[in-house]
């Protein structure tokens, strides 16, 4: 080992060739003990330094690293502030939050010139005291060593112990470990850390994320006995032809000459011994098992075992035990297809940043458990660790729960090579082909691989994200293949320079449209395909996802990763006591990309967004198609049959469950079968307008991530009943129809309807004195722009529709008494558009108190942009906030996002308002048959389809224009009314991306086609 450097240097901060000083070589994250542990026991050779530290913020220009007094053991830090570790300086109030996507955060304040760092460079001076725990100190006293490890920091650290400089480190997403044995003394010790905001490493860490700093993962001490297993490289292979496993491990043993033997034992997690051996200790100790009778690992059935290696001294005593959990599996590319244990795999994935609204990247174990629970519950089988190695515990969870991982190097340099308008500047790309960056980049991927190599869940190594291409990536790829000849290499950046196609084993693209992907798949490609990012889930998004899922019919299409998992918004308490989820720019940070980090399928508080409803159904491994003779079940799982699931079969009569049974259907993995079901259709056909045949796949037993009976997938088919949509009722004899000079009205059954000749529609609708018309319902042709709408220029393209309905004028009306019981009013409106299209609103009221409402748009003969939405908006008193409806649900649906379950659902306007980071269109329900809008006493309004055509509906505490004006959810006013929108149609939400791609044409509303809204309304 080279002599240690004992003096810190500021020059390292701007030298790309210096990225680690005195750092311990990267190694596996196996767990060590001073004894033979029980399964799952924590290490007794580690000591946490998490907790309260002291901290002071200074500028880099104020520090002399060679003679820095704050590092001295006797330095008086009583004036320092306090901070918890792990945490971020920004979240603790010591630095300002900044969010940018592509650009470097100092761009414009200074001209970014690599490898230089900004003149304004914050430094956090951390200090804390510690006493080495007895077990660790015993190892030190007996010839062993003690190290300190920083598991996560940003961006560069200098470390001193008791005034002695012990090391410098960059790449804060893999361990920075330093040997501190010589610096320790008995009793209380002091560790001091200078944590820099910027270093040359900042050029490699331009991830689309909040720019957060500090010691954000755990800090710990670890003892290494005088004979120590430094590294374990374990190959746990599974041979699908023989259905057996094999173990091949290489151990790096320090001071092996001081040990006699190394014994290895493989156990299942119940402690049963599967295999064991013993051999003489050597510096490189190889362990080979031969064939093993073990279960294979997969996301579907994540069987794990524990390899336990014990070092025995010459005196027969245990020197050290090392444990490593392993899963036996084989992941290879064969014939251009990625296969797990011999079977083609499809990644049903998401890209996941580590994030918590209060803690930033300093997420807790419970956060990770919540995330993986969400994944399993929503049929997500793969995660890309975008764009850096994650906390080590996440990999343990993925091994245990069953998640495939693309493990991604901490590398993104988007701002170095991309100008506005996606203009590529190859010469400025970092690292590109610049030799001064090569060692740092190779070191980053090496550190990740060494740490995570033994995890069964890691199936692909990724070289980084959005960093263009170049010889440096070729060097990284070569290194990965040398270290691991089995797992494939992933890198999307070569799409910008195909000269470097050899860098990646996988054709990976971002935001390629389904038709573009299909074109590749039809070209007889040599490489398998994945979308490392697709379905940009910003705000109200994830439309037309089914077009991508349909590509699974091509063998070389192997899935994609939704961008992304969680909204990244910082929870802040405002001066008035309210809380706000803040996004870029809210902290005065400039430049900023504002709300562009709000892309999650879960909200920042980890509650599922409505988008997750479609993701769960479309990602399901079991596809179910009921029919009148039974059900067809396709099992897309690779290894597990459906025998261990329960299938609940139901018949719904107009949404109401009338029959249910529980059955078992055994479909082997990869097969499709039909099962007969004796649906009691004839018993209920005459009682309903439509019958829904439903089959639901549910857990037969509880899992770690869900309780027994949890639904994973469903299938529904609607068949016709023989009952008409609405049976006519007998007219009451005491009804009154009045045609006045200014108004006309109908009274009957305690209800009164008043239609105005001057106001352009209904002006009163009462039941027992309760008024349901605050103002005449207005035409609506607008929706609050979604993030995708804004990105695609929807506001500009369809600006004419913003006020077309709102400001339409009534140009004609006719009111007539049809008969003794019925009144008809027809209002002709001219839309406020250049085309001046005429729309007809017709009310037919009778003495039962019912109202038949129809709205007709004839289709425009002149050229006009497609229509965002078309129907009526009805303003109701605020107490009418409850919504019960029959249609797909329970969450919101749109024309291109409605893989929901048909049924009768109960919600309310507040819960139905999805709190997207930027307020926007929300709460729509497609294909509604009827809906009831009521107060808590059950009084209200029922809206039903008239005839066979369903409608779209939403009930919100805010109007579209309120949503359009607000920048944050807390800016929306306290609700004073409810806004009921009854629509003939609303356009889809899109999802290909949020900056360029419009909603697909089939989900638009053409202006030249007629639209017809036809509903019955009654008060209840």
What are these regions (language model features)?
Residues 2-41, 164, 203, 318-632, ...:
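Extended substrate-binding grooves/exosites of carbohydrate-active enzymes
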Residues 91, 197, 298, 679-688, ...:
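Beta-strand/loop-rich accessory regions of lumenal/periplasmic or secreted enzymes
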Residues 3-24, 29-31, 39-40, 54-58, ...:
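Accessory beta-strand-rich segments of carbohydrate-active enzymes
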Residues 159-161, 244-280, 631-663, 675-676, ...:
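Beta-strand-rich binding/interaction modules
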Residues 205-229, 577-626, 632, 636-656, ...:
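Catalytic cores of secreted or luminal carbohydrate-active enzymes
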Residues 2-105, 194, 549, 562-570, ...:
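Accessory carbohydrate-binding/adhesion or oligomerization-edge regions at the termini
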Residues 185-188, 250-334, 687, 691-732:
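Extended acidic/polar, glycine-enriched regions
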Residues 96, 101, 105, 110-116, ...:
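An acidic-aromatic loop/edge-strand motif
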């Amino acid at each position: 080992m080279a002599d240690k450097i004992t003096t810190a240097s500021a020059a390292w901060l701007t030298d790309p060739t210096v990225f680690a000083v005195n750092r311990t070589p990267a190694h596996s994250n196996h767990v060590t003990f001073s004894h033979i542990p029980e399964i799952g026991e924590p290490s007794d050779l580690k000591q946490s330094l998490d907790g309260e530290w002291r901290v002071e913020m200074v500028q880099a220009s104020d520090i002399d690293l060679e003679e820095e007094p704050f590092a001295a053991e006797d330095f008086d830090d009583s004036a320092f502030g306090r901070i918890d570790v792990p945490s971020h300086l920004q979240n603790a109030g010591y630095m300002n939050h900044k969010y940018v996507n592509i650009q470097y955060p100092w761009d414009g304040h200074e001209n970014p010139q690599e490898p230089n760092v900004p003149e304004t460079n914050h430094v956090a001076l951390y200090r804390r005291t510690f006493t080495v725990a007895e077990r660790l100190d015993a190892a030190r006293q007996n010839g062993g060593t003690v190290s300190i490890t920083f598991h996560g920091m940003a961006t560069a650290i200098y470390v001193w112990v008791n005034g002695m400089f012990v090391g410098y480190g960059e790449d804060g997403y893999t361990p920075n470990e330093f040997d501190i044995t010589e610096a320790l003394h008995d009793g209380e010790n002091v560790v001091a850390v200078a944590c820099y905001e910027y270093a040359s490493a900042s050029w490699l860490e331009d991830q689309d994320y909040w720019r957060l700093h500090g010691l954000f993962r755990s800090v710990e001490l670890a003892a290494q006995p005088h004979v120590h297993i430094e590294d374990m490289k374990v190959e746990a292979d599974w041979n699908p032809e023989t259905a057996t496993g094999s173990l091949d491990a290489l151990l790096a043993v320090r001071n092996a000459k001081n040990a006699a033997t190394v014994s290895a034992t493989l156990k299942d997690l119940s402690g049963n011994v599967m295999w064991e051996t013993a051999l003489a200790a050597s510096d490189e100790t190889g362990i080979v098992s031969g064939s093993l009778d073990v279960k294979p690992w997969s996301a579907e059935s994540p069987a794990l075992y524990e390899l336990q290696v014990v070092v025995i001294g010459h005196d027969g005593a245990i020197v050290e035990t090392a444990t490593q959990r392993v899963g036996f599996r084989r992941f290879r590319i064969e014939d251009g297809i990625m296969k797990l244990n011999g079977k083609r795999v499809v990644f049903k994935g998401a890209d996941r940043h580590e994030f918590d609204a209060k803690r930033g990247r300093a997420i807790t174990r419970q956060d990770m458990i919540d995330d993986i629970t969400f994944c399993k519950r929503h049929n997500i089988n793969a995660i890309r660790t975008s764009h850096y190695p994650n906390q080590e515990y996440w990999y343990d969870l993925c091994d245990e729960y069953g998640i495939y991982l693309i493990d991604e190097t901490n590398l993104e340099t988007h701002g170095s090579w991309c100008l506005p308008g996606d203009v590529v500047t190859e010469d400025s790309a970092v690292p590109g082909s610049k030799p001064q960056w090569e060692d740092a980049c190779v070191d980053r991927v090496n550190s990740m691989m060494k740490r995570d190599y033994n995890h069964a869940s890691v199936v692909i190594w990724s070289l980084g994200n959005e960093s263009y291409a170049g010889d440096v990536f070729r060097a990284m790829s070569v290194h990965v293949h040398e270290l691991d000849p089995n797992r494939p290499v992933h890198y999307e950046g070569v799409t910008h320079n195909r000269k470097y196609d050899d860098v990646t084993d996988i054709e990976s693209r971002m935001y390629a449209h389904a038709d573009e992907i299909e074109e590749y798949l039809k070209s007889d490609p040599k490489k398998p395909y994945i979308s490392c990012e697709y379905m940009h889930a910003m705000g109200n998004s994830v439309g037309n996802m089914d077009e991508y899922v349909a590509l699974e019919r091509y063998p070389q299409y192997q899935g994609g990763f939704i961008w992304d998992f969680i909204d990244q918004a910082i929870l802040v308490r405002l001066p008035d006591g309210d809380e706000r989820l803040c996004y870029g720019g809210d902290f005065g940070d400039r430049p900023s990309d504002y709300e562009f980090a709000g892309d999650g399928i879960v909200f920042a508080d980890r509650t599922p967004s409505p988008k997750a409803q479609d993701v769960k159904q479309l990602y399901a491994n079991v596809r179910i198609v009921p029919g009148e003779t039974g059900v067809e079940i396709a099992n897309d799982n690779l290894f597990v049959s459906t025998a261990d699931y329960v299938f609940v079969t139901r018949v719904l009569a107009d949404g109401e469950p009338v029959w249910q049974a529980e059955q078992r259907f055994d479909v082997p993995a990869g097969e499709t079968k039909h099962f007969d079901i004796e649906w009691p259709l004839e018993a209920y056909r005459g009682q309903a307008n439509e019958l829904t045949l439903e089959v639901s796949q549910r857990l037969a037993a509880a899992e770690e991530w869900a309780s027994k009976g949890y639904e994973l997938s469903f299938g529904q088919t609607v068949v016709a009943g023989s009952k008409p949509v609405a049976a006519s009722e007998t007219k009451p004899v005491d009804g009154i129809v009045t045609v006045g000079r200014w108004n006309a009205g109908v009274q009957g059954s305690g209800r009164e309807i008043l239609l105005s000749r001057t106001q352009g529609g209904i002006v009163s609708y009462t039941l027992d004195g309760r008024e349901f018309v605050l103002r005449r319902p207005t035409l609506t042709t607008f929706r609050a722009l979604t993030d995708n709408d804004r990105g695609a220029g929807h506001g500009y393209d369809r600006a004419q529709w913003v006020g077309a309905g709102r400001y339409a004028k009534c140009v004609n009306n006719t009111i007539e008494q049809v008969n003794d019981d019925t009144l008809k009013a027809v209002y002709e409106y001219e839309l406020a558009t250049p085309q001046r299209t005429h729309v007809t609103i017709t009310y037919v009221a009778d003495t039962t108190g019912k109202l038949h409402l129809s709205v007709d748009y004839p289709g425009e003969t002149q050229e006009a942009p497609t229509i965002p939405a078309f129907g009526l908006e009805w303003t109701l008193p605020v107490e009418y906030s409850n919504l019960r409806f029959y249609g797909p649900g329970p969450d919101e649906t749109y024309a291109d996002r409605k893989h929901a379950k048909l049924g009768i659902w109960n919600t309310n306007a507040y819960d139905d308002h999805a709190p997207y980071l930027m307020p926007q269109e929300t709460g729509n329900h497609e294909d509604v048959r009827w809906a009831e809008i009521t107060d808590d006493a059950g009084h209200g309004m029922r809206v039903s389809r008239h005839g066979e055509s369903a409608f779209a509906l939403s009930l919100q505490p805010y109007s579209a224009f309120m949503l359009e004006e607000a920048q944050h959810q807390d800016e929306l006013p306290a609700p004073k009314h409810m806004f009921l929108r009854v629509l003939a149609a609303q356009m889809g939400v899109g999802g290909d991306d949020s900056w360029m791609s419009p909603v697909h044409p089939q989900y638009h509303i053409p202006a030249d086609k007629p639209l017809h809204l036809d509903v019955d309304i009654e008060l209840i």
